[in-house]
């Protein structure tokens, strides 16, 4: 599932976003991304973390194409229930509607695959999305880190592998004129792991922190009235 609903906070304090934590990597030549306040014209594509953003954060009028098991290997083969409650495949959705901005955040479910095949399929998948929506600004989201405890118990789902994939995603964004957005700076501990107090399962933030994540997206990219 997307979010964890516990109420534990790492230090009993609410997160406040510093100026340093609201900086996106926006390559030169990338289209300017400015979101409408109600997120209309925005599409979020992703896995369980995006499901969490949809269920626990306020994505307003955004469309969401996300599923807990989603990966770049299954993205164009799955159907998902949209805001309208109708089911749709991604290609059908991208061919029938026009989006201003598309957020793309996948990668954690892919980590068990051969690494080179992950990067190649990720690139192919993003390129296909862009071909179907050539006028949309593409935002590639870094994969959220896991906690130190979660990482220590797995040779696959650990932050070394997540960081390697995130570096390749960032390079892809820079090479293709997309925007790269890394939320880990908001939720990491001092050692670069997902801070344990933000999570109960080691891989997702608690339900209440998805609204912090959405606020960070708004502050980082900026919003304007429709």
Label each residue range with its predicted role.
Residues 105, 141-142:
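Alpha/beta-hydrolase-fold catalytic nucleophile elbow
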Residues 133-137:
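A short helix->loop->beta-strand "cap" motif at the edges of active sites that frequently abuts
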Residues 146-226:
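Catalytic His-Asp segment of secreted/periplasmic serine-dependent ester chemistry enzymes
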Residues 1-45, 50, 54-55, 225:
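N-terminal secretory targeting modules
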Residues 32-121:
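Conserved SGNH/GDSL esterase-like catalytic core that processes O-acyl groups on lipids
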Residues 92-93, 124, 128-129, 216, ...:
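A generic secondary-structure signal
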Residues 117-125, 159-163:
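Charged helix-capping and loop-helix junction motifs
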């Amino acid at each position: 599932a997307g979010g964890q609903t516990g109420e534990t906070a790492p230090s009993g304090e609410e997160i406040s976003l510093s100026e340093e934590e609201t900086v996106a990597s926006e390559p030169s030549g990338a289209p300017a991304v400015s979101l409408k306040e109600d997120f209309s014209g925005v599409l979020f594509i992703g896995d369980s973390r995006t499901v969490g953003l949809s269920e626990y954060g306020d994505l307003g009028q955004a469309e969401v194409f996300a599923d807990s098991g989603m990966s770049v290997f299954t993205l164009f083969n799955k159907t998902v229930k949209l805001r309208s409650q109708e089911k749709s495949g991604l290609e059908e959705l991208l061919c029938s509607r026009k989006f201003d901005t598309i957020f793309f955040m996948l990668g954690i479910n892919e980590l068990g695959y051969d690494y080179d095949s992950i990067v190649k399929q990720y690139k192919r998948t993003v390129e296909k999305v862009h071909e179907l929506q050539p006028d949309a600004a593409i935002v590639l989201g870094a994969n959220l880190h896991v906690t130190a405890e979660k990482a220590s118990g797995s040779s696959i789902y650990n932050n070394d592998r997540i960081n390697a994939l995130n570096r390749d995603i960032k390079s892809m964004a820079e090479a293709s004129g997309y925007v790269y957005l890394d939320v880990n700076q908001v939720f990491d501990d001092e050692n670069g792991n997902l801070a344990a107090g933000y999570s109960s399962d080691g891989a997702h933030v608690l339900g209440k922190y998805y609204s912090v994540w959405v606020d960070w997206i708004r502050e980082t990219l900026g919003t304007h009235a429709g």
